[in-house]
């Protein structure tokens, strides 16, 4: 079919949420002429749910996005109202940063960044169809009949695909925050042959700040110690005038109100059909599932400096409006609170992610990529991470360059994508530290050491960032080498000082690095014995040194595991393999292999329902040029 295109682009990104923004910035910065199409320009990088960025595992993803040259970290560092490091009482593997955002300022700043980006056109328009010829993308069709040519298309439509808002018995077609739903595009994706699922998420009511009795709640301040998401942010710019959050709880009265109105709850009346998020359940779901709990935490989170809206975190609901009012007024501190917005549920279509490659390109259609909630994930951070990788790979494909696949040992982003494409998801997917088997090497503090060189190689890390990274890496390497070269001997003068500090004396000579492995010895104490570094070290370098030294044994074990898995990841499986030709593998394994079509032995080994015997048979088959027999 011959198309009359009115405009031509290298890459078209559909949807300007957190995934779409990262995808379009990546492609344009890598030199591709890019169109970012959105239903509503005023909702670019909008936060329709929680006014925050980061959190457990998610905060590390934001650091990874920044290390690769993405935008989310820099943008939140310019627009936060509170910053807090989580899990400081636990080990370094689970520490993560979380920021309360000024949500309107966050969106405005990101829009400004997009508007001034070279090679990037921002357009308010609705895309109805993705145009495909001979199994590859050639462009898109707008609702107004315009055809735009493209060599690659990235779908980042969030919850807009056939979106429906549900509030009590009210149900209507809508995207998030009462924006337009994208129904025709949802139909088009199904017609193209993609398998579609249906998920649900929700959001809590917003209440008026001046109507809250804060005396009845517990203050939750931010941190005094400077922290940032972007490796380029300076401690001197750390916000001193932070806005606190507040903690309150549900109570028995709250639970009674919910229980008495369960028959009116869309989740229980049958109105809601989509699968909801396991790790962010509605309050009515929590009351039913955890009936033995006397109360549930609720955090009151300001949505910005210049708004009265306060987000009631933990109270996600689609109960009728009158029930929501009664529920709010049953909570300590909210007895007289004014509800400014009701909570609601939203159902939406997703592309089942087992149909994707690890590049986030669909297996079915060449040049078609999907990212974010379109792939069944929840959360701004998960969306942004996918958007960045989809954008990078769309640009690399257009340019005829080698693709980028982040492994599970490279990044949390790699863990997430591997989970999605290998295991799929039956519910909105959320990243957790427990999903990462190599979490000790996927830390908040070393994201730049892991990923900045990759970002530089693909063209997203500019000269300023690269120079700063090289300085940091050299300082780290030099100081680690110095600490490993200086010996502390168990002489009287040294041991007298050690004992004065209340520590056990040395019995053998050891390096300063070995001395630092003692739990009680930090960097400051170590250098008081061996002298300071040749140049002043940033606090973040010192933190990195302490972690790498104290956990060296565990880190080495993890790296050994990575090396073993790497050998499996390097064993490729032909794309045209005939799974029916492999004798003796279990029926379940054969079915899963056909569905997922894994690209490596490593990926095949992680598929649910596949056992080691199946992998052994597969490897024998591949090594024997297509012949596999069970050995007895």
Swiss-Prot record:
GO term, biological process aspect, one: tRNA methylation
Positions contributing to NAD(+) binding: 276-290
Keywords, comma-separated and alphabetical: Cytoplasm, FAD, Flavoprotein, NAD, tRNA processing
Classification via Pfam families: GIDA (PF01134), GIDA_C_1st (PF21680), SAM_GIDA_C (PF13932)
Family membership: Belongs to the MnmG family.
HAMAP family xrefs: MnmG_GidA
Identification of the protein by name: tRNA uridine 5-carboxymethylaminomethyl modification enzyme MnmG
Native organism: Streptococcus pyogenes serotype M3 (strain ATCC BAA-595 / MGAS315)
